[in-house]
């Protein structure tokens, strides 16, 4: 008991005067200590045993509060060979494993006592012995175990006695482990003058506590001071575990290292370490340590601990509305309905309702009724009318009605609805308008017939309408594939009642509709007619007929040629005819050899390798630039073929534009020159805002003013616009230092892209863009690839590093000059003159079978999407190329990057279909991204591409249905992780379908192979669940 004072101290045998001081005996207890013995609190006699009897003396005095003060004293310093023992009563150890003994005592300085230098001591010894029961009066000192020799930090003298100064010493010793039920303590004196004022025996515990809303019970620490006891807490009332709450009990009785926590359940909030129910008028919808919230408008609650507020009468909350959203009500009726009618179309327009009910999801429905003279005699209009775009779920305030009948009273009821209209039992408010039709349009075409069919064509005819109501201007024929009725259609016109439709697919059924146009307008479309194109056998029969015609024509032509030949021989003009014919044939052969076959309206890619001289290919597709128009400013990069500079290009009549310039170094090989010019001849064929633009080339004239002999051909890939190397000094005339000799460089001049390659640009600006901005970048890349695909060009190295970004964030596809050599060794990498093509971007069929196509470019585009959404992260991270190939073969696909909307990741998965024919076309991708940009809310909706995925349930891959998550894990040989999934709360397939690779690592799946197998199965499960839900991904 620190800080206590002795009330009375009496030294025996007359050597000292009594020392009287006040001692209250009121000592505070520490919360982490459990006291087994405290002599200062014992009210009766201690009854400790002494040996011999004339050794230790017990002295008891009463303090001012009438409480006893027990002391034991000994001072036999005059006689040698002292051996005085004092033993406590039996002490129960309770739950202790280690005990602590605190002793308060005073000790006389031997130097202050005359004539006792040989016999006086200044220490005493502490002993103990364990026992399961009391020994009574039996006492055998030899059986006791020594704990320690106790010495005083301060000893008193005769002067201290005179000045009434008490020097009290406190010493603590620990004993353990204690294994029996109890123990004795013993004090041995061998000749000291000492007074044992108090003895306190205790053990330490980590006391009951509440941390992070979790309760932890009293805990006894281990004997080993370096070992901690892990204790799991239990959540306080009205709370639940978020992460398992844990504390560690230290050897000193202190709680250490808090882990995990509990959170208040729904309807409860945390106040001063406990969970209290929300007051009436307040709610809390989700478990967590947030405060209760006031009920939103038009809702209330009158009880405590409410998780959701109830809507007032007439107000509702939709199923998907969050609890924090105000209750809303159905809208009022639309206003100001008006119509506009012509011969063939009726347009209905209206104003929004005056009261939207507090919601933004307003839609309209139009109900049509045909009424007679009596307004009460109405019937439904049926399927005869067509509504554009549709009669229900309208977002805009108008609709077009077609195919109505003349001289009929139509009543249109326009209803306004929102997300809670279906919850109300009240009739839906509407506004009605009645329209009487009177049209002069032609009647419908009644019949269409097929005259003949080939593999790619159909010849159709029909009869003119019975009532045209004027001169027929033309016919419009609309047609589409029967299987793709809802996707797209084509149309053509004919002035005659017949038409030949070309460009069709063989053995395919098409649907045709036809309508008439007169001066009064269009008629309605006819009913649908089905016709099928022919197959190869039908064309063979047609070809046989054509052969007969050709053979007949050939015989006639040969006869005519003989007659003409005789005629020219007779007239003497045969020689002129033969020369002219030879000249014409030679010109035609030369034209064919150069592969310059052009078709009107169609631009196709021409491989520069078909030209003997690469310079011919370059000048076929790109213009020569006068070197005097080029001003070089600085070197911005270096590569295999030379250096890349930035500069300015002067254009007559226009201002200077920034450009990037690269040349071929002097002393180059013919192969290097061919590869260098090949890139320019490829770029020169492209003209698209999302393709890097070639300004021109320099191949014919020397350029001594520049004096540059080396430029890098890989500048379109290596982020050159960011300045890879420190700029070289440039003279005022625009040339580099004279140490570089003048020469005759081959130069390629392209537009300057300020922000460099896309991957490094995104890494530099990580997290700076909105999702819509990133989608805009992806849309630009897809548009450029669509252009290349339409031209028949396969890129084969599409990656973010090969996309360049200008100052307006426009992305442009680059890197067209790399030659791609596929070695015979099946283990060979796909090499180029610029290095290896990374496996991570390459489609599996291109890796396995060397099959590059637009579909393999689509696979690479999916990887580019992942790079963009992850801000330039490396695909497949640190996996080796071999692991990447094996993972893809096993069905593994990259997970969604952080913050990536579900619809974009789903598009990536479509691009990574193993069957290349199932991947979307770039046309589909551009269309889909356009819709996302127009409707950003669709970014967070899971979609399925019906052009990519199987079109009927029978085409869906077989996937077993599992009853439990454990069954699913067993099926993929991962049953050892059942407890991990259960403990983490992933107990339903809906939750599992949303798991990411981070979730799988977090629950304890460490092995990469196991992670890969589980992720692969989750992706298959997710696609299967999407088919079950029958969601559409329309492009």
Curated annotation (Swiss-Prot):
Entry protein name: Ephrin type-A receptor 6
Lineage of source species: Eukaryota, Metazoa, Chordata, Craniata, Vertebrata
GO biological process, alphabetically ordered: axon guidance; ephrin receptor signaling pathway
Gene of this entry: Epha6
Source organism of the structure: Rattus norvegicus
UniProt short sequence motif PDZ-binding, positions renumbered to this chain: 1033-1035
Keyword check for S-adenosyl-L-methionine: no
Function summary: Receptor tyrosine kinase which binds promiscuously GPI-anchored ephrin-A family ligands residing on adjacent cells, leading to contact-dependent bidirectional signaling into neighboring cells. The signaling pathway downstream of the receptor is referred to as forward signaling while the signaling pathway downstream of the ephrin ligand is referred to as reverse signaling.
Domain SAM, first and last residues per copy: 960-1024
UniProt domain Protein kinase: residue ranges: 630-943
């Amino acid at each position: 008991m620190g800080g206590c004072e002795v009330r009375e101290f009496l030294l025996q045998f007359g050597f000292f005067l009594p020392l009287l001081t006040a001692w209250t005996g009121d000592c505070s207890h520490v919360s982490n200590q459990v006291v087994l013995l405290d002599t200062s609190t014992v009210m009766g006699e201690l009854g400790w045993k002494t040996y011999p009897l004339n050794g230790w003396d017990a002295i008891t005095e009463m303090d001012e509060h009438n409480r006893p003060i027990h002391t034991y004293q000994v001072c036999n310093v005059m006689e040698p060979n002292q051996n005085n023992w004092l033993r406590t009563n039996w002490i129960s150890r309770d739950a202790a494993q280690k005990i602590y003994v605190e002793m308060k005592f005073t000790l006389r300085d031997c130097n202050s006592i005359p004539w006792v230098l040989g016999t006086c001591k200044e220490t005493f010894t502490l002993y103990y012995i364990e026992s399961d029961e009391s020994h009574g009066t039996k006492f055998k000192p030899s059986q006791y175990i020594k704990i320690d020799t106790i010495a005083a930090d301060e000893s008193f003298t005769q002067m201290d006695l005179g000045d009434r100064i008490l020097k009290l010493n406190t010493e603590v010793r620990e004993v353990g482990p204690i294994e029996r039920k109890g123990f004795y303590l013993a004090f041995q004196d061998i000749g000291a003058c000492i007074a044992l004022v108090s003895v306190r025996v205790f053990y330490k515990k980590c006391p009951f506590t509440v941390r992070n809303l979790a309760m932890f019970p009293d805990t006894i620490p281990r004997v080993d001071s370096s070992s901690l006891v892990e204790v799991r807490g239990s959540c306080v009332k009205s709370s639940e575990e978020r992460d398992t709450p844990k504390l560690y009990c230290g050897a000193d009785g202190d709680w250490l290292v808090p882990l995990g926590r509990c959170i208040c359940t729904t309807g409860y909030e945390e106040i001063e370490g406990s969970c209290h129910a929300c007051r009436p008028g307040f709610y809390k919808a989700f478990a967590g340590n947030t405060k209760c919230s006031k009920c939103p408008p038009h809702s209330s609650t009158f009880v405590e601990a409410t998780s959701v507020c109830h809507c007032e009468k007439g107000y509702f909350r939709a199923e998907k509305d969050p609890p924090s959203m105000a209750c809303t009500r159905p809208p009022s009726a639309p206003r100001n309905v008006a119509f506009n009618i012509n011969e063939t179309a009726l347009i209905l327009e209206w104003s929004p309702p005056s009261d939207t009910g507090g919601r933004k999801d307003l839609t309209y429905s139009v109900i049509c009724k045909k009424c007679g003279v009596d307004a009460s005699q109405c019937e439904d209009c049926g399927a005869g009318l067509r509504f554009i775009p549709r009669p229900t779920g309208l977002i805009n305030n108008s609709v077009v009605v077609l195919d109505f009948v003349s001289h009929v009273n139509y009543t249109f009821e326009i209803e306004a609805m929102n997300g809670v209209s279906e919850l109300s039992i009240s009739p839906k408010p509407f506004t009605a308008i009645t329209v009487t039709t009177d049209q002069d349009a032609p009647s419908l075409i009644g019949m269409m017939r097929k005259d003949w069919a080939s593999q790619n064509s159909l010849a159709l005819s029909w009869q003119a309408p019975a009532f045209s109501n004027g001169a027929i201007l033309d016919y419009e024929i609309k047609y589409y594939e029967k299987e793709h009725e809802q996707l797209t259609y084509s149309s053509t016109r004919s002035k005659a009642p017949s038409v030949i439709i070309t460009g069709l697919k063989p053995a395919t059924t098409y649907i045709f509709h036809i309508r008439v146009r007169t001066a009064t307008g269009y008629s309605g479309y006819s009913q649908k007619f089905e016709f099928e194109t022919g197959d190869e056998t039908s064309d063979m029969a047609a070809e046989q007929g054509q052969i007969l015609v050709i053979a007949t024509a050939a015989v006639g032509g040969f006869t005519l040629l003989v007659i003409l030949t005789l005629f020219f021989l007779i007239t003497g003009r045969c020689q002129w005819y033969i020369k002219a014919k030879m000249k014409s044939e030679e010109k035609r052969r030369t034209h064919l050899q150069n592969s310059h076959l052009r078709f009107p309206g169609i631009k196709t890619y021409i491989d520069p390798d078909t030209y003997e001289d690469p310079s011919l290919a370059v000048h076929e597709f790109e213009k020569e630039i006068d070197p005097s128009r080029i001003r070089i400013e600085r070197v911005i990069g270096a590569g295999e073929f030379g250096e890349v500079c930035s500069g300015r290009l002067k254009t007559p009549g226009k201002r200077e534009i920034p450009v990037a310039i690269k040349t071929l170094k002097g002393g180059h090989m013919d192969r290097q020159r061919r590869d260098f010019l090949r890139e320019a001849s490829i770029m020169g064929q492209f003209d698209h805002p999302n393709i890097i633009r070639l300004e021109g080339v320099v191949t014919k004239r020397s350029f001594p003013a520049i004096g540059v002999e080396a430029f890098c051909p890989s500048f379109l890939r290596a982020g050159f616009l960011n300045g890879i190397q420190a700029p070289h000094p440039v003279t005022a005339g625009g040339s580099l230092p004279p140490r570089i000799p003048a020469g005759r460089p081959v130069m390629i001049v392209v537009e300057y892209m300020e922000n460099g390659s896309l991957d490094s640009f995104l890494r530099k600006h990580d997290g700076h863009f909105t999702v819509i901005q990133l989608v805009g970048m992806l849309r630009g890349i897809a548009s450029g690839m669509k252009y290349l695909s339409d031209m028949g060009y396969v890129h084969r190295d599409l990656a973010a590093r090969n996309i360049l970004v200008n100052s307006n964030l426009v992305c442009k596809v680059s890197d067209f000059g790399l030659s791609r050599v596929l070695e015979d060794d099946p283990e060979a990498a796909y090499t180029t003159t610029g290095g290896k093509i990374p496996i991570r971007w390459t489609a599996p069929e291109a890796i396995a079978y060397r099959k590059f196509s637009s579909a393999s470019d689509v696979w690479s585009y999916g990887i580019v999407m992942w790079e963009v959404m992850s801000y330039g992260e490396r695909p497949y991270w640190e996996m080796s190329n071999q692991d990447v190939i094996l993972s893809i073969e096993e069905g593994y696909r990259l997970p969604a990057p952080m913050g990536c909307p579900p619809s974009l990741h789903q598009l990536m998965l479509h691009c990574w279909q193993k069957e290349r024919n199932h991947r979307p076309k770039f046309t589909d991708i551009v269309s889909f991204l356009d819709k996302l940009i127009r409707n950003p809310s669709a970014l967070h909706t899971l979609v399925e591409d019906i052009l990519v995925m199987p079109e009927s349930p029978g085409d869906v891959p077989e996937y077993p249905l599992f009853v439990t998550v454990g069954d699913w894990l067993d099926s993929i040989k991962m049953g050892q992780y059942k407890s991990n999934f259960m403990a983490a709360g992933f107990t339903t397939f809906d939750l599992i379908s949303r798991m990411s690779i981070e979730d799988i690592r977090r629950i304890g799946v460490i092995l990469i192979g196991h992670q890969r197998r589980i992720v692969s199965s989750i992706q298959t499960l997710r696609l299967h669940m999407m088919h079950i839900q029958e969601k559409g991904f329309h492009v």
